Amino acid sequence: MAKIAVTGGSGKAGQVVVRDLIEHGHDVLNIDRLPFTNALIPDTPAAYLPADLTDYGQALEALSGGDVLPGIEIVVHFAAIPSPVHATPDQIFRTNMTSTYAVFSAAARLGVRRVVWASSETTLGLPFNRPPDYAPVDEAHMYPETSYALSKVLGEEAARQISRWSGIPFVGLRFSNVMVRADYDEFPTFWEDPHLRKWNLWGYVDESHVAESVRLALDEDATGTDNFIIAAADTVMRRPSRELMEEVFPGVPVRDSISGNDTLLDIAKARQVLGYDPQFTWRTLF
């Protein structure tokens, strides 16, 4: 078991990860501006340090564990403005880039064993006002269309270079739209109009998949850097995936292997390299 610092552990996905890592026996330090603020993990015994991670000095001190959990071995970096609609483009870019660089640089200086961090599906071309080149989109389909997506693409490059300088492995997880159980109540509102969720090719990722992918990334036999799309194995829609593509993105090539409600965010690399195997589907709830 390891001592793990989770930045942004008070956020929606961060809380899920903190809870899961503790349940699997790790010692976890949540580093965030604010402590936990809702009932996702009311009884989770996570240590906490407040920090402004856009400040390198605060990032360095917090990631050392301070007197709260000294000797941090692994960093899981989730702290960020979480989407293109949560602030102005300039605020998003400045905050996300500055904090990511500070966290990565501090992790390298402290000599941690590994960094696992939240990249994003937005790197792939969301919101797809420009149709995708093909479907399902894979890790090579890089079209950042917002300052948020650009901050993630440049975060991946920062990870690559800081890994090269330090020798520390960096694993980037390009999460789809994260869902916790309460979010599934909204799914029926998507089903009548396929255009409502075309912006991410009808993708989603369940909280259980997020937790699973982080745990797998902790154990990946990796050197250097790598990035993986992390999504559910299906879409948010009842209609078949090919039918959705033909209606909303006519003419876009769809791989022959796609059938039924298969995801259009390619998770083959995560399956092959990480052993990622997302079992949960919202279809069990309706």
Question: Which role does the model predict for each range below?
Answer:
Residues 4-24:
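N-terminal Rossmann NAD(P)H-binding glycine-rich loop of SDR-like oxidoreductase domains
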Residues 51-54, 91-99, 142, 146, ...:
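Glycine-rich NAD(P)-binding loop of the Rossmann-fold in SDR/ketoreductase-type enzymes
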Residues 102-145:
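Conserved Rossmann-fold NAD(P)-dependent oxidoreductase catalytic core, especially the SDR/UDP-sugar
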Residues 165-169, 180-192, 216-227:
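Glycine/proline-rich active-site loop of Rossmann-fold NAD(P)-dependent oxidoreductases
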Residues 150, 171-179, 185, 194-216:
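Substrate-positioning beta->alpha
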Residues 94, 130-167:
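Catalytic helix-loop patch of NAD(P)-dependent Rossmann-fold dehydrogenases
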